[in-house]
Design a protein with these regions (language model features):
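Active-site loop segments of alpha/beta catalytic cores
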Residues: 119-286
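Short, glycine- and charge-enriched coil/turn segments that flank and shape catalytic ligand pockets
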Residues: 2-3, 42-44, 106-115, 175
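Intrinsic-disorder/low-complexity, polar/charged segments
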Residues: 46, 53, 102-106, 162
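Short low-complexity stretches enriched in small and charged residues
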Residues: 24-33, 96-99, 160-161, 218-219, ...
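Glycine-rich, aromatic-flanked loop segments that form ligand/cofactor-binding clefts
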Residues: 13-29, 70-96, 118-162
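N-terminal basic, low-complexity leaders that serve as flexible interaction/assembly modules and, when applicable
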Residues: 1-91, 228-229
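Glycine-rich, proline-tolerant flexible connector loops at the mouths of alpha/beta enzymes
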Residues: 74-94, 99-104, 110-116, 199-220
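The substrate-binding groove and active-site-proximal loops of carbohydrate-active enzymes
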Residues: 48-49, 110-121, 178
C-alpha cells in the first residue's frame, strides 16, 4: 500500500498537480553551514557515526526545516553506506572525502555478498523518527546511489574526476563489471523499498558519475537500464511513490533517460539548458 502524502505541496507538484507555490528543497540542505549541525557532528565523533545513529541523523535531517520554510526533508545519510553493508571498509578523510577498500579483481566481485540489508537498519529507523516529527505538509525524501556510481567508488576506492581504475576495469572485464552492477541493482532496489516502508514519500536515485559512462558510450547499458530496472521494481510494489532521477552530466542524453525510465521527476545539473530540455521533454516534469 502506498504511503502518499496528499497534503504536501512537494508531492502534489511532483505528480503534476496544481499547487499554491513552487516547492523548495536542497539536495544538501543539512550540513556544515548550520552551527547546530557542526555541534552535533563534533559530538558524534565522525561523519559515519552521525549517519548511522538514528536519533542524531534524524535531528540533523530536521534542522534545516526549523530554520527555513522548506517543503521537504531529505534523509541525512550517504550513498556509500551500501558498500559498507557488504563489508567494504569505508572512512571519510578530512579534505579528501571517502576512501574505501577497492575491488581489485574479478574474484572479489563474484564472492561479494550483498545480503546484509539489516546493516542499514539505522537508516530506516532514522526515516521513521523523522516521519513521526515532520509536519504533515512537509514531504520526506529517501535516496540511494545508482549501481554505476556505487560500482565506480567500489573499484576506484575513492572519489575521482575520471575514475581511471573503474574505466580500465569495465573495459577489460565487462562481464564481471555487469555482475557487480546486477548485484548492486538488486540491493539498491530493496534498500529503497525499505526506505519507503519506513516513511519515505519520494525517492531520489543519484547517478552522480553518469558522465564517466557517457564518455565511454556505455550510458544506456550502465546507467539507464539499471536505473530503469530499479524504478520498475519499486513501482510494482509502490506505484504511487514518486521517483526522482539524477543522471548528473548526462548532457544530451537526459531526454533518453526520461523516455526509457519514465521517471516521475528529473533532477538536472548546472550545465543544462533548461528551456531546450523542457522543449525536448514536452510534458515531462523537471
Amino acid at each position: 500500500m502506498d504511503k502518499l502524502n496528499n497534503t504536501s505541496n512537494f508531492i502534489k507538484t511532483i505528480n503534476g498537480l496544481n499547487s499554491s507555490q513552487t516547492p523548495i528543497w536542497l539536495m544538501r540542505q543539512a550540513g556544515r553551514y548550520l552551527p547546530e549541525y557542526r555541534e552535533i557532528r563534533k559530538g558524534a565523533g565522525s561523519f559515519l557515526n552521525l549517519c548511522m545513529n538514528p536519533k542524531l541523523s534524524a535531528e540533523v535531517t530536521l534542522q534545516p526545516l526549523k530554520r527555513f520554510d522548506l517543503d521537504a526533508a531529505i534523509i541525512f545519510s550517504d550513498i556509500l553506506t551500501i558498500p559498507m553493508a557488504c563489508n567494504r571498509d569505508l572512512k571519510f578523510i578530512e579534505n579528501e572525502g571517502p576512501h574505501l577498500k577497492p575491488i581489485e579483481n574479478e574474484r572479489e566481485i563474484f564472492e561479494l555478498e550483498l545480503t546484509s540489508i539489516n546493516y542499514l537498519e539505522p537508516i530506516y529507523e532514522c526515516l521513521s523518527l523523522v516521519k513521526s516529527q515532520l509536519e504533515t505538509e512537509k514531504a520526506l525524501i529517501g535516496f540511494a546511489g545508482a549501481p554505476f556510481t556505487i560500482a565506480a567508488y567500489m573499484i576506484e576506492g575513492k572519489g575521482s574526476k575520471n575514475f581511471p581504475k573503474c574505466v580500465s576495469f569495465f573495459q577489460n572485464y565487462e562481464k564481471s563489471f555487469m555482475e557487480l552492477i546486477k548485484k548492486l541493482e538488486s540491493f539498491i532496489s530493496n534498500h529503497l523499498i525499505k526506505q519507503i516502508e519506513a516513511g519515505a514519500e519520494a525517492i531520489q536515485i543519484f547517478e552522480s558519475h553518469a558522465e564517466i559512462a557517457l564518455k565511454e558510450n556505455k550510458f544506456k547499458k550502465y546507467c539507464i537500464e539499471p536505473n530503469n530496472n530499479i524504478i520498475r521494481k519499486i513501482k510494482r510494489k509502490y506505484p504511487s511513490i514518486p521517483i526522482i532521477g539524477f543522471p548528473r552530466n548526462a548532457k544530451n542524453l537526459y531526454t533518453e533517460y526520461v523516455s526509457i525510465t519514465k521517471i516521475d521527476c528529473l533532477s538536472i545539473d548546472q550545465n543544462v539548458n533548461i528551456k531546450g530540455l523542457l522543449n525536448n521533454l514536452k510534458k515531462k516534469k523537471v
